[in-house]
Amino acid sequence: MNILKKPFFEEAIEACRYFWEAGWGENHAGNLTYLLSDEQVQEIKEDEDVKKTAPTQIAMTFEAKELIGKYFLVTRAGAFFRTIHKHPEKDLGIVKVNEDSVDIIWGFENGIMRPTSEFPAHLLCHQARLKQNPENRLVMHCHPTHTIAMTFAHEIDEEKFTRTMWRLNSECVLVFPEGLGMLPWMVCGEGAIGPETARKMEKYRIVIWPYHGMFASGTSFEDTIGLIETVEKNAQVYMLNGGNIKNGLTEDQVKELAQAFGLWD
């Protein structure tokens, strides 16, 4: 089978296109990393293009010891979500994590290109989430419009932000009962924001970067995108009300919901 016809490739390409159409992946915005299963790794190793291509090795400036030997599908630095479907061999790559480097074994235009600049944040988040859930597969970064807008209108405090979200819709506490993580504003890219995001990911599946976007993680594309959609939809409700929430679920009702579905003690 053509490597691009594998279901996880098709899902990744479809997700990128969807994010652009939703307005969450403008210009170079957005990136994703998908952890391949053992079965998927074996399929990739048996691909003829992979067999005949010598890996390109690039240095790794951070530690991800618990991911050594793991394979990831990654978007490239500078990729446009809008056009990934037109040239996936350039905009996507498969990498293998080593102790202090990564091997590009497929894609990125035969290893010429490089993984997203937020690759360190991605791998550190995978490492954090796998400790909480061994089935975690995906980390996505995007710029959901109303969620970003809400960070201008709401206090930058993750507990207060979470409680506001939970009050807006019964689905919120059911979809993210652990709450939402939030960082203060930080410089994006390869710096301190990566370890700080990963630290939040030890508890939360979504971490909001104020005035920028969010990182989200999950066990599948459906799981992760559904999580993002839920946050974004209710941020939109908040902004449509001008941040002036007079009614909504009470704290007791939120607790009742969570307990009814076995999410809280």
Predicted regions span which residues?
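Glycine-rich flexible loops
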Residues: M1-D265
